[in-house]
From Swiss-Prot:
GO MF term set: identical protein binding; protein folding chaperone; protein homodimerization activity; unfolded protein binding
Function description: Small heat shock protein which functions as a molecular chaperone probably maintaining denatured proteins in a folding-competent state. Plays a role in stress resistance and actin organization.
Modification Phosphoserine, positions: S15
Protein name: Heat shock protein beta-1
Record keywords: Chaperone, Cytoplasm, Cytoskeleton, Nucleus, Phosphoprotein, Stress response
Superkingdom to which the source organism belongs: Eukaryota
Subunit structure: Homooligomer. Homodimer; becomes monomeric upon activation. Heterooligomer.
Every sHSP domain range: 83-193
Gene responsible for this protein: hspb1
Family: Belongs to the small heat shock protein (HSP20) family.
Keyword Transferase set for record: no
Length: 201
């Protein structure tokens, strides 16, 4: 099957889909190229995170051994809640499928339409993004990613569309081909014609 690229359409206003009871799946923790938030981990002793942080990035207060008794349960829960909130609010993709439509929504806030490529090949949807090194509040950063999704066998590849919202959410949709109707068996009676009238056999 030949490779096919999907053009973008930009959404000028955000749209919200009505929730349904069909299949839905989400993929978390896809924050492409985001730096770690040290406040999420500063409340934990360094012995709990062996080799996680680079020595050059550790601040003196993090390097000081601390006793687990110093950590109040409420304080620990607050740090965990912030870490979970950050994880769930960035880089999330969602797949939804109904009887008529298949849709993937991917959070790509750091990429412009020119830096994104959406294409299909051999029943696989591939979304990739890349931008060269640029400066942000943490220094210089370059980002790239590639995500592949297996399309349903009944998806209409020729009618796949994609759109990018102002909030940086990329949505790709593919209509689902309806199966051929199955007709029940019907026996047709045979009429026998006679010279005077038509008799039913």
């Amino acid at each position: 099957m030949a490779e096919r690229r999907i053009p973008f359409t930009l959404q000028r206003t955000p749209s919200w889909d009505v929730p349904d009871l069909h299949q839905t799946s989400r993929i978390f923790d896809q924050a492409f190229g985001l730096p770690p938030v040290f406040e999420d981990f500063s409340g934990f002793p360094t012995t709990h995170w062996p080799g996680y942080m680079r020595p050059s990035l550790m601040t003196p207060d993090i390097m000081i051994p601390q006793s687990p008794m110093m950590y109040h349960p409420g304080h620990m829960m607050a740090h965990q809640a912030r870490a979970l909130s950050r994880q769930m609010s960035s880089g999330m993709s969602e797949i939804k499928q109904t009887q008529d439509n298949w849709k993937i929504s991917l959070d790509v806030p750091h990429f412009s339409p020119e830096e994104l490529v959406v294409k299909t090949k051999d029943g696989v949807l591939e979304i990739s993004g890349k931008h060269e090194e640029r400066k942000d509040e943490h220094g210089f950063v370059s980002r790239s990613f590639t995500r592949k999704y297996t399309l349903p066998p009944t998806a209409n590849i020729e009618k796949v569309t994609s759109s990018l919202s102002p909030e940086g959410v990329l949505t790709v949709e593919a209509p689902i081909n309806k199966p051929a109707l199955e007709y029940s068996e019907t026996t047709i009676p045979v009429n026998v014609e006679s010279s005077g009238a038509v008799a039913k056999k």
